[in-house]
């Protein structure tokens, strides 16, 4: 899509708020097709920003902007350092959209999950695994999609800027998965793999404005309960 097409869609919508979630989010795909990634992950949000005068624009970014950070985290908004094309494009998107629309909100989202999804996510991957699972000593947040939706009214009221957005954790992905299998009564096995770069975030900035999430383990338990899985 080009700028004129985006402008027409926005004008015809008569929307007061635009929430942009679309992306090419597969890191490997972005590495293989950087031009497509740039169009989807940078140019389209910029086109939206150009067409959003007088409207509140909310764009989903990614925790991948922290992939190259040298410290162990958890990471604050001012510590971004991408290490792949997807993360670099998301960071450029944030900067360019905010330059055009300073009141817009950039949400650095985590890996999201739900029991109903057309594509794999943490919850479904673990529930449907047929072989031994392997997770490294990596600290990262994963977020229940329902809590994302529940927070959107508060997100709309956020001052313009960049916000870490999702569940916080004090457990590694291996520890989380081990606990997840225990509470579901699964006989599936999980083994600890090699250490992987952390992606956990400090979400205190958003929390100061009332945008709060369950911790990672509590979010998983809530999701399992909501769908009658425990």
Predicted features and spans:
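NAD(P)-dependent short-chain dehydrogenase/reductase
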Residues: 95-141, 145-147
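NAD(P)H-binding glycine-rich loop region in Rossmannoid oxidoreductase-like domains
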Residues: 1-40
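Conserved Rossmann-fold NAD(P)-dependent oxidoreductase catalytic core, especially the SDR/UDP-sugar
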Residues: 46-83
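Glycine-rich NAD(P)-binding loop of the Rossmann-fold in SDR/ketoreductase-type enzymes
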Residues: 1, 32-44, 77-80, 88-91
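SDR active-site strand-loop-helix element
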Residues: 18-22, 57-63, 107-109
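Mid/C-terminal beta-alpha module of Rossmann-like enzyme folds, strongest
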Residues: 151-198, 202-203
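C-terminal amphipathic/interface module of NAD(P)-dependent oxidoreductases
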Residues: 186-188, 193-230
């Amino acid at each position: 899509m080009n700028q004129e097409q985006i402008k027409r869609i926005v004008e015809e919508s008569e929307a007061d708020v635009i929430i942009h979630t679309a992306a090419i989010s597969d890191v490997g795909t972005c590495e293989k097709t950087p031009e497509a990634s740039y169009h989807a992950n940078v140019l389209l949000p910029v086109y939206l920003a150009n067409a959003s005068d007088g409207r509140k624009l909310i764009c989903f970014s990614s925790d991948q902007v922290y992939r190259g950070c040298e410290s162990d985290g958890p990471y604050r908004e001012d510590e971004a350092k991408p290490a792949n094309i997807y993360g670099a494009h998301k960071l450029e998107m944030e900067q360019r959209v905010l330059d055009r629309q300073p009141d817009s909100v950039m949400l650095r989202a985590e890996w999201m999950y739900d029991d109903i999804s057309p594509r794999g996510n943490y919850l479904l991957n673990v529930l449907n695994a047929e072989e031994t699972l392997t997770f490294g000593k990596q600290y990262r947040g994963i977020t229940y999609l329902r809590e994302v939706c529940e927070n959107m009214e508060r997100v709309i009221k956020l001052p313009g800027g960049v916000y870490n957005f999702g569940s916080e954790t004090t457990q590694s992905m291996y520890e989380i998965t081990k606990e997840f299998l225990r509470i579901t009564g699964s006989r599936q096995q999980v083994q600890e793999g090699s250490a992987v770069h952390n992606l956990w975030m400090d979400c205190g900035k958003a929390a100061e404005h009332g945008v709060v999430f369950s911790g990672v383990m509590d979010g998983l338990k809530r999701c399992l309960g909501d769908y009658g899985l425990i």
